[in-house]
């Protein structure tokens, strides 16, 4: 069971290989990239405890030596001090420009390690081995790397494409139900932004996906990655179409900031709630029928996911403060906030023509329900 999606960027093309049993075969996939048989792996402590020795064995089968650094798990690792620690460790390992760094973990590790690779010796190659559903379908593909700032999420970073992505769906079996469903928020996003047929497939197959059906998981990852690859090829540095991939993120990032990037709200949970709010805003503006946000929420609820602000534990700031947090989003251009809205399921578009009063009303209604 192996699917390959080619991200066909001029001069920087790479494969995303999706399947079962890729970790034990990692050496065979990575070896053709190496000038000498060694790699530096950066992971987090949770993934290290579960999968690091399997990766070491998979690399050793092809004679590849591995050194490893395990950072604390969690969003707080996506910040300056862990970045400095990672770069310092890579320099201590004497990683050369011709070597390969491996990002082995979820979205936090992929973003951090990709950024470290981008700035180390002005750019070394790296391989993504994503271990969460969110990372497999989204953050490991497309070359966005970076860290968070006190002022907002993903505000410091670089575009740096990986040389290879290995998405082994077997490792998804070690995720908690909450982490798996957080990643599913990004999967649903793809159907909502541009593929109604995929969303309908998810409505039918989502429960099997969550229950561990390998065929369904492979298909969901493949379709998500293919859609992202197609968009990235058209617009690598987010000058146009790539912004569609931020459906749900303008609201979601503000909610993450409001909860202090803590365990109260995982990134994918914020995206799922953000998608529901984006469709609510679209309906309020008369762009789509009220049936669209209702159907989005119905599917998320059926999957046991967070769908509304009342699903977030603890207090939240008021609507005006949330709107101000949205203004820190990296999608602001000339002081104007860009929204990804929709004319219906699978029909998203980018616009800055949104009245602040409409956004405030949607947020106030959502907070009232809390």
UniProtKB/Swiss-Prot annotation:
Q: Give the domain of life.
A: Bacteria
Query: Taxonomic lineage per UniProt?
Result: Bacteria, Pseudomonadati, Pseudomonadota, Alphaproteobacteria, Rhodobacterales
Tell me, in a sentence or two, what this protein's role is: Catalyzes the conversion of 3-deoxy-D-arabino-heptulosonate 7-phosphate (DAHP) to dehydroquinate (DHQ).
Cofactor(s) annotated in UniProt: Co(2+); Zn(2+); NAD(+)
Indicate where this protein is primarily found: cytoplasm
- Enumerate the residues binding NAD(+): 107-111, 131-132, 144, 153
For biological process, the GO terms are: amino acid biosynthetic process; aromatic amino acid family biosynthetic process; chorismate biosynthetic process
Family annotation (Pfam families): DHQ_synthase (PF01761), DHQS_C (PF24621)
Name of the protein described by the UniProt record = 3-dehydroquinate synthase
Q: Where in the cell is it found?
A: Cytoplasm
User: Which reactions are catalysed by this chain?
Assistant: 7-phospho-2-dehydro-3-deoxy-D-arabino-heptonate = 3-dehydroquinate + phosphate
Q: Where does Zn(2+) bind?
A: 186, 249, 267
Per the record, its GO cellular-component terms are: cytoplasm
Q: In which pathway does it act?
A: Metabolic intermediate biosynthesis; chorismate biosynthesis; chorismate from D-erythrose 4-phosphate and phosphoenolpyruvate: step 2/7
What keywords are assigned to this protein? Amino-acid biosynthesis, Aromatic amino acid biosynthesis, Cobalt, Cytoplasm, Lyase, Metal-binding, NAD, Nucleotide-binding, Zinc
**Keyword DNA repair in record:** no
Q: Name one GO molecular function term.
A: metal ion binding
- Tell me which EC number(s) this protein carries: 4.2.3.4
* Species annotation: Roseobacter denitrificans (strain ATCC 33942 / OCh 114) (Erythrobacter sp. (strain OCh 114))
On whether Ribosomal protein is a keyword of this UniProt record, the answer is no
Q: How is the cofactor bound?
A: Binds 1 divalent metal cation per subunit. Can use either Co(2+) or Zn(2+).
Q: Please report which protein family the annotation says this sequence is part of.
A: Belongs to the sugar phosphate cyclases superfamily. Dehydroquinate synthase family.
Tell me the HAMAP family matching this sequence: DHQ_synthase
Gene name for this UniProt entry = aroB
């Amino acid at each position: 069971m192996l699917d390959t999606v080619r991200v066909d960027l001029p001069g920087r093309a790479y494969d995303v290989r999706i399947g079962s049993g890729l970790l034990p075969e990692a050496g065979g996939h990575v070896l053709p990239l190496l000038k000498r048989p060694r790699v530096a792996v950066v992971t987090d402590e949770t993934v290290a405890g579960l999968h690091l020795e399997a990766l070491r064995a998979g690399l050793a089968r092809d004679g590849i030596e591995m050194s490893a650094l395990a950072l604390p798990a969690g969003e707080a690792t996506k910040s300056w001090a862990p970045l400095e620690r990672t770069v310092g460790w890579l320099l201590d390992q004497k990683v050369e420009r011709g070597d390969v760094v491996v990002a082995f973990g979820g979205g936090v590790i992929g973003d951090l390690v990709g950024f470290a690779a981008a700035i180390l010796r002005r750019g070394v190659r790296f391989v993504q081995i994503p271990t969460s559903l969110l990372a497999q379908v989204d953050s490991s593909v497309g070359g966005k790397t970076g860290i968070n700032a006190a002022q907002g999420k993903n505000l410091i970073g670089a575009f740096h494409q990986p040389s290879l992505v290995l998405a082994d769906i077997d490792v998804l079996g070690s995720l908690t139900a909450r982490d798996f469903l957080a990643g599913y928020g990004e999967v649903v996003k793809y159907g909502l932004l541009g593929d109604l047929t995929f969303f309908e497939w998810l409505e039918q197959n989502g429960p099997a996906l969550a229950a561990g059906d390998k065929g369904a998981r492979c298909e969901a990852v493949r379709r998500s990655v293919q859609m992202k690859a197609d968009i990235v090829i058209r617009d690598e540095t987010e000058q146009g179409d790539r912004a569609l991939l931020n459906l749900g993120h303008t609201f979601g990032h503000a909610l993450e900031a409001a909860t202090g990037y803590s365990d109260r709200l995982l990134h994918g949970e914020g995206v799922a709630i953000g998608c529901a709010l984006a469709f609510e805003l679209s309906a309020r503006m008369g762009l789509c029928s009220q049936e669209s946000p209702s159907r989005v929420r119905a599917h998320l609820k059926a999957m046991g996911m967070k769908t509304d602000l009342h699903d977030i534990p603890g207090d939240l700031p008021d609507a005006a403060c949330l709107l101000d947090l949205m203004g820190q989003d990296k999608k602001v251009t000339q002081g104007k906030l860009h929204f990804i809205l929709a004319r219906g399921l699978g029909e998203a578009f980018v616009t800055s023509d949104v009245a602040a009063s409409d956004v405030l009303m949607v947020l106030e209604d959502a907070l009232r329900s809390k």
